[in-house]
Amino acid sequence: MRLMLLTAGTRGDVEPFAALARHAASRGHEVRLALPDDAVAPAGVDWVRLDLDVQRILSPAGRTPWALAHHLRAEVRPAMRRTIVAAVRETVAFEPDLVVHHPLILSAPMVADALGVPRVVVEFAPVATASARLPAAGGPTATRDLGARNRSTYAVPRAIARLFDGDVARAAAELPGGRRPGFRSPSRATLMAVSPQLLPRPDDWPERVHQTGAWYEEASAASPDPVVADFLAAGPYVVASFGSMAKGDASARGRAIVTAARTHGLRVLVLTGWGGLALPAECDGPDVLVVRSAPFDHVLPGAALAVHHGGAGTSHAVARAGVPAVVVPFMADQPFWGAQLHRHGVAAAPIPLRRLSADALVQAIGDALSRRERATEVGGLMRRDRGVRQAVDVLESL
């Protein structure tokens, strides 16, 4: 079977698709992965680019309403237009038997219909699959149970997607015959790449929604950095990572984390990512190591604690490692995951970004450390998940 995989977003959106691509290829399928231009090219995968620079669209030059509106017009909207067109062009060129796509690939339904092939949508948090049991993960009510009104919150992401309907229609020029199909078929299935240990399946999800657990490589091919390995072996440590987030004062965040960790006698591995964390000179010392990134499967298993932004991928990686957490959400589905981790006993109550301080972290770290036993239990259960295997089983059954 020829599988076209299309994803958009940050590392947490790309790496799971790469894991799916590798596993599907290992089972004899022909797979092509379309991904953002600034994503690391995955080894051993046939890939193409989507004319999308995610870091650029996540980094507006200012935080005033005017600056954000200008950024939306000048960067976000044009980037989405290019991605919509590139997704159509690359999918048509590959001639797939099945299209598997991220919800942000807004032209995927159109191109699948035009080619007469089924499609499957992938969710890393419940945003497109509505439920009366919980609110949409990415909206302003993501951490509040609205009861009977929960289902209405899913209208927000649908309304945002409709803003680009005109761009999707114009991308039909890339289709065979240059015309948009006069219908839109529903997805054949939804792959909810979420662990039931962090989000038990709501009883009103339809049968076509398959909750597979998270997608990750079962064995890392990367070798640990000797400098990082030596640091980790020297005593208890915290892993601090805000991934792709870069909003606000990175040095102030680094200072708060290092100060709070030292209060608890912990050393700190700072992963600077896209610039969301930095270490002020006055905080430097032998108990702190700063690197841009490191494989989570190397640095998390021995950690006493993780401080992170609550992205879906990071939340699953930390919980799967059996490590308690302090979550500082920035945006999107991060407040949802911070609340879920706390609800299931593996993290302290989330600290809103605007309230982050050394004092707040001292208290939260103490709380999180007391949850080690529960984190170990949940991690053991999550490591039984075989997300990519189950996902490919579903694709093969369609």
Where are these regions (language model features)?
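Short glycine-enriched loops at secondary-structure junctions
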Residues: 53, 125-126, 274-275, 331-333
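Nucleotide-sugar-dependent glycosyltransferase catalytic domains
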Residues: 32-237, 242-255, 262-266
